[in-house]
């Protein structure tokens, strides 16, 4: 910073840029000189003694370099804007942001209320899933009942009422009271169809055979196997294999009578033959925590076709009461478990 004395005794503080104008001002002066708008005499004048006569000096004072800032004025021409407009713009922006915030809070509240409203639907989904599973099981049991007993279209009381009114039993499968049919047959009622007589005789003979076997003190494994086979549908199923395992272990432990009694008791309670076999593995002590027997076979083709879909990888410690019937071991050492 240097200090120089101007004409008329005024002293002003100037910077290096004041004495050496920038290229912008020099270019502008050159353009004005070449076009003749500024006389040459105005340029080559006594700047020190007559600064007021110099056009360039006036232009330097009235049009300063935008890149420089005078020490007396702190206003930058680039920032020479209306601050009121900036304030108004910021205020409007703040208003918009506030409105968006309010809208977001309202949307969040609506989403929360919607979630609260959907909670009963979530709970209902569990109930529907449970009902679906139970209904599927019930339909499967009903189909099994229809296949094994025929579709009953009326109760025993309704059958008796129809028979008494029309003088003949209703068409199709129906439920009959054993004592009522016995009385009709013994009284030689001519309205009893031949098919009903044959069915009653077969039922009567089966009952007597069951009572005979049930009262037999020592039942053989072969007889017990045949009795269980007679109750099972199909052939070579996993339950047929389970019958063989039950009879084999029962014979080794002298528990055939207990197994037979348990089987008949389950049937008397209304259980299916398959369910009765499973109950034996869970109720008779010799099957609790018992490992399934290992059966050596040459190839997978030796396993009955009805058992193929029930084969599973063998777990570390299979148990009969957990549904593992037996373990098939192939010649190459690979094992397959039969699971029900």
Curated annotation (Swiss-Prot):
Residues 96-116 form a coiled coil. Residues 1-24, 33-48 are annotated as: Disordered. Pfam families: Filo_VP35. GO terms for molecular function: molecular sequestering activity; RNA binding. InterPro entries: Filo_VP35 (IPR002953), VP35_IID (IPR031163), VP35_IID_b-sht (IPR043061), VP35_IID_hlx (IPR043060). Changing residue 322 to A: Complete loss of dsRNA binding activity. Changing residue 309 to A: Partial loss of IRF3 promoter inhibition. Complete loss of dsRNA-binding. Residues 33-48 are annotated as: NP binding region. There is a cross-link at residue 309 (Glycyl lysine isopeptide (Lys-Gly) (interchain with G-Cter in ubiquitin)). Changing residue 305 to A: No effect on IRF3 promoter inhibition. The interferon inhibitory domain (IID) binds dsRNA. This is Polymerase cofactor VP35. It comes from Zaire ebolavirus (strain Mayinga-76).
